[in-house]
């Protein structure tokens, strides 16, 4: 047995000599160097010695479980060996100190090292233990050979360390990583061999001394003096343990689990695994009985930079329960409500003072102005009043203070009302012309006293009203001066509002982006350009001319050059199919785009998403011009139109805006609308013709260009340079 282990030992002598590696190892190494050229031979040798199986090694490397040395910081060879020996001796001493009572014999051998301060004992108790267990199993085999070398071992420590264990430097390397380096076999075995069989149980005792913090000297200082060296060895060991905790990958060998107490057992087991010699059984039996030393709980955690760089796994933050948040809110609310009454009362007082000041100022200003500006005076006074009435309502007051303050408020308000009420009545006729909001504001003017009891009037409402009424008082002047204008302005406002609403709604769904279309896009009733003519919102009994102008109105709002809708209608009239479709669509909503697709109906009902588009032509066979639906977006107003037609369009648009609201102006709109159309139609059709020819030309050019590009190989498959304004690419991106 000893010969065999000796052979394997020598075969794994220092890494620098690769000549002695057995062929199997060599083969593995070659394979690995081919696969991972950036790994140094040393690192690979370590791995190969650690895991027999090539697959596991490859797996470890690819998954990042095994790390290279330079990623941490590779101490130079000599330094490493020196460190190792120091560490090992230290560990032995640590253990020996713990076992002094039971093992006088082994003590004698190491007297020369006893100067190590006991403070470090706890630190190494695990590793020492495991290493002893580990060596214990071999000591009998090695004892004869190694007793002679023990005397040499301390002098030539640096050379010898490489050959220390049965696995030689492979182990040494790994020990460095695992932070639990074994005692050099030479010294350990010679020490232990005397009482190999007798002492075995004693070796399993846990260390007794408490752990103390290891001082952290940098590795650079290692060589300088011995004590520093020993301490730094410890520091390094602690760091390495930490490092393993960051990467527990370091293989079975370093399979140290994150918390130090668990280290002892897995290490001793994994070490025994890594020696395929027959001493496995004994080593394992030892390791199974060994118990972790509890003192190491207090071991300080050293961080390597590698550990620091590694992103920490964040402890999952417990989200605060919504209930708790609710309770916090309630608490805050309670606090606020207690503070509020006083604050509210203060505010009320301030407001009342302001109210008392403002009317006088306003009146002074007003008196300065000349009589012809009565109207503006009225409006100013009105606004002053509104301010008064609105302000007292501003603070939202809890019920109790309200009662108290209501008298305060009522008092100033009443006399003022007396002075201003005539003005308010004067304004009454004007109210008819004003929009509703203002009416409300003025009505509230008439009952200032009511405010104090009115608990529902919220602060915000009051303030916003104040602002509104203040600004709206201005338009009032003009309204009263030129009464004949009001109906028109009102109408314009309404029309504009309606148009804006329609516009907004339109953009909300249909084409947010030019050139964007989705499959079901045009089957909805509301899409104005493609189908503008059929979908105009008209009364069912409407005559044909009326349809025309309504269409005009709708397309006008959406910025479709109004001629187009009519073009569509004329085409429709020309083809019987389209006319029929149009009729149907006015009676009952047709789900699919007017074309005859017999089973489409069912799809549309059973699928939540739009239907496939077989190209525009497939869906809208009766829509003759090819890209009809896109026209409006791309050329909203044709540039080439004659000025007359343009002005006519402008007219139409304006009329259409009013048309929905003011029934009176409808006849007019229809008249001019139908007049202008006749002229424009021919023109516009000609233009359309040109436009489509031009587009086709462009498409051909583009296709040619794309083909050329594809041959050069510069363009990904299926992609022809995407041009937003071209029809060709539009449906696809």
UniProtKB/Swiss-Prot annotation:
The keyword Amino-acid biosynthesis does not apply. PROSITE patterns: CUE. Ubiquitinated. It is found in: Cytoplasm; Nucleus; Chromosome, Telomere. Keywords: Chromosome, Cytoplasm, DNA damage, DNA repair, DNA-binding, Nucleus, Telomere, Ubl conjugation, Ubl conjugation pathway. Residues 84-103, 158-171, 180-198, 206-223, 243-278, 382-404, 424-448, 457-497, 542-557, 580-590 have a biased composition (Low complexity). The keyword Cytoplasm applies. Residues 68-83, 318-333 have a biased composition (Basic and acidic residues). GO terms for molecular function: DNA binding; ubiquitin binding. CDD domains: CUE_DEF1_like (cd14368). One of its GO terms (cellular component) is chromosome, telomeric region. Residues 1-14, 104-117, 279-293 have a biased composition (Polar residues). Residues 24-66 form the CUE domain. Residues 1-24, 61-343, 366-497, 518-590, 633-682 are annotated as: Disordered. It comes from the Eukaryota. GO terms for biological process: DNA repair. Homodimer; may form higher order oligomers. Interacts with the large RNA polymerase II subunit RPO21; the interaction is direct and serves to bridge RPO21 to the Elongin complex in a manner dependent on transcription stress. Interacts with RAD26. Recruits the ubiquitination machinery to RNA polymerase II for polyubiquitination, removal and degradation, when the transcription-coupled repair (TCR) factor RAD26 fails to efficiently displace stalled RNA polymerase II. Also involved in telomere length regulation. Binds DNA. Belongs to the DEF1 family. This is RNA polymerase II degradation factor 1.
């Amino acid at each position: 047995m000893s010969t065999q282990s000796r052979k394997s030992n020598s075969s794994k002598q220092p890494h620098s000599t690769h000549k002695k590696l057995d062929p199997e190892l060599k083969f593995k190494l070659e394979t690995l160097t081919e696969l991972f050229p950036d790994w140094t031979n040393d690192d690979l040798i370590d791995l190969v010695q650690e895991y027999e199986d090539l697959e596991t090694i490859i797996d470890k490397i690819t998954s990042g479980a095994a790390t290279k040395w330079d990623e941490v910081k590779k101490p130079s060879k000599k330094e490493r060996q020196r460190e190792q020996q120091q560490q090992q001796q230290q560990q032995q001493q640590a253990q020996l100190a713990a076992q002094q009572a039971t093992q006088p014999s082994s003590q004698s051998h190491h007297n020369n090292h006893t100067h190590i301060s006991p403070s470090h004992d706890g630190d190494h108790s695990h590793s020492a233990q495991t290493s002893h267990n580990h060596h214990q199993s071999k000591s009998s085999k090695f004892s004869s050979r190694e007793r002679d070398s023990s005397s040499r071992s301390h002098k030539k420590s640096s050379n010898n360390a490489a050959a220390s264990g049965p696995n030689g430097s492979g182990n040494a390397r790994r020990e460095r990583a695992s932070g639990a380096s074994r005692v050099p076999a030479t010294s350990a075995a010679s020490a232990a061999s005397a009482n190999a069989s007798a002492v075995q149980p004693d070796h399993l005792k846990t260390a007794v001394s408490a752990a103390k913090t290891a001082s952290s000297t940098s590795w650079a200082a290692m060589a300088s003096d011995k004590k520093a060296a020993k301490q730094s060895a410890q520091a390094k060991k602690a760091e390495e343990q930490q490092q393993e905790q960051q990467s527990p990958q370091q293989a079975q060998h370093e399979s140290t689990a994150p918390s130090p107490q668990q280290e002892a057992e897995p290490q001793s087991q994994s070490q025994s695994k890594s020696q395929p010699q027959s001493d496995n059984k004994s080593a394992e039996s030892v390791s199974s009985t060994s118990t972790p030393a509890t003192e190491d709980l207090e071991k300080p955690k050293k961080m390597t930079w590698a550990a620091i760089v590694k992103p920490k796994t964040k402890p999952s933050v417990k989200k605060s329960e919504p209930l708790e948040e609710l309770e916090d809110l309630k608490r805050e609310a309670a606090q606020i409500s207690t503070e509020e009454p006083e604050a509210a009362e203060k505010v009320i007082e301030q407001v009342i003072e302001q109210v008392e000041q403002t009317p006088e100022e306003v009146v002074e200003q007003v008196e300065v102005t000349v009589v012809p500006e009565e109207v503006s005076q009225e409006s100013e006074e009105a606004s002053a009043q509104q301010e008064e009435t609105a302000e007292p309502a501003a603070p939202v007051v809890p019920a109790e203070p309200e009662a108290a303050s209501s008298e305060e408020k009522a008092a100033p308000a009443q006399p003022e009302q007396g002075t201003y009420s005539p003005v308010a009545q004067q304004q009454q006729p004007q109210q008819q012309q004003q929009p509703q909001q203002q009416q409300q504001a003025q009505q509230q003017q008439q009952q200032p006293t009511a405010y104090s009891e009115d608990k529902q009037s919220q602060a915000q409402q009051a303030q916003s009203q104040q602002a509104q009424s203040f600004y709206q008082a201005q338009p009032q002047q003009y309204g009263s001066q030129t009464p004949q204008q009001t109906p028109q302005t009102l109408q314009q406002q309404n029309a504009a509002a309606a148009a804006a609403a329609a516009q907004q709604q339109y953009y909300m769904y249909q084409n947010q982006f030019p050139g964007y279309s989705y499959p079901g896009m045009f089957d909805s009733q509301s899409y104005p350009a493609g189908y503008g003519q059929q979908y105009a919102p008209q009364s069912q009994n409407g005559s044909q001319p009326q349809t025309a102008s309504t269409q005009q109105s709708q397309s006008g709002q959406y910025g479709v050059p109004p001629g187009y809708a009519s073009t569509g209608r004329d085409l429709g009239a020309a083809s019987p199919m389209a006319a029929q479709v149009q009729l149907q669509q006015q009676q009952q909503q047709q789900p699919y785009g007017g074309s005859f697709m017999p089973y489409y109906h069912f799809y549309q009902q059973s699928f939540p998403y739009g239907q496939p588009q077989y190209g525009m032509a497939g869906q809208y066979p009766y829509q003759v011009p090819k890209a009809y639906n896109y026209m409006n977006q791309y050329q909203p107003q044709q540039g080439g139109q004659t000025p007359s037609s343009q002005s006519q369009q402008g007219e139409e648009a304006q009329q259409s805006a009013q048309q929905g609201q003011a029934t009176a102006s409808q006849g007019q709109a229809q008249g001019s609308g139908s007049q202008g159309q006749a002229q424009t139609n021919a023109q516009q059709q000609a233009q359309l013709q040109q436009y489509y020819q031009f587009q086709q030309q462009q498409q051909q050019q583009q296709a040619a260009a794309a083909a050329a590009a594809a041959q050069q190989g510069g363009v990904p498959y299926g992609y022809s340079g995407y041009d937003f304004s071209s029809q060709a690419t539009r449906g696809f991106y």
